[in-house]
Swiss-Prot record:
Alphabetical list of NCBIfam families matching this protein: membran_MsaC (NF038270)
Keyword Transmembrane: yes
Cellular component annotations (GO), alphabetically ordered: plasma membrane
Signal peptide segment: none
TM regions (residue ranges): 3-23, 27-47, 55-75, 103-123
Function: Accessory element involved in the expression of sarA and several virulence factors. Modulates SarA production and/or function in a strain-dependent manner. Affects the transcription of the accessory gene regulator (agr) and genes encoding virulence factors including alpha toxin (hla) and protein A (spa).
Membrane topology, as annotated: Multi-pass membrane protein
UniProtKB keywords: Cell membrane, Membrane, Transmembrane, Transmembrane helix
Source superkingdom: Bacteria
Lineage: Bacteria, Bacillati, Bacillota, Bacilli, Bacillales
Protein name: Protein msa
Annotated source species: Staphylococcus aureus (strain bovine RF122 / ET3-1)
Subcellular location, record wording: Cell membrane
Length: 133
């Protein structure tokens, strides 16, 4: 249970730091940090816990919630629309669509499926490690 709480607090701190940084970071760097850092924290602590399915469920639930709050926070900033326009001009050679509209269900679904897939893979890896030892 302590690893579950540690994971939730660590991921909350990550999204808190990203919220504090706000729009002072490149959009691609922010996207990569959002995708890599929370799953790395969750993955490392997943191998230490005994609550496999509970751990996976609560991590996905809370990381999705943190992601939602982070996006709502960014979109509420006064410079958000000009920031998106400037970032899209900078990324014109890369095929990325970023809009200033509210993010929707598809982003949360992608993030949930991404987290679920990674944690299921880690679950099976953990089972294989246990059976070999």
């Amino acid at each position: 249970m302590k690893y579950l709480i540690l994971s939730l607090v660590a991921n909350l701190l990550v999204f808190g730091v990203l919220s504090a940084i706000g729009l002072n970071i490149n959009i691609l760097a922010a996207m990569m940090m959002i995708l890599v850092i929370p799953i790395t924290i969750s993955g490392i602590l997943f191998f230490k816990t005994n609550l496999d399915k509970t751990y996976i469920f609560f991590n996905i639930l809370f990381i999705d919630f943190y992601y939602y709050i982070y996006n709502v926070h960014l979109m509420a900033l006064p410079r958000f629309n000009s920031y998106i326009k400037a970032e899209m001009m900078e990324l014109e050679d890369i095929d990325v669509l970023i809009t200033s509209k509210d993010f929707g269900f598809d982003e949360i679904l992608f993030f949930t499926l991404y987290l679920l897939l990674i944690l299921i893979i880690l679950y099976y890896l953990k089972k294989q490690v246990k059976t070999k030892s």
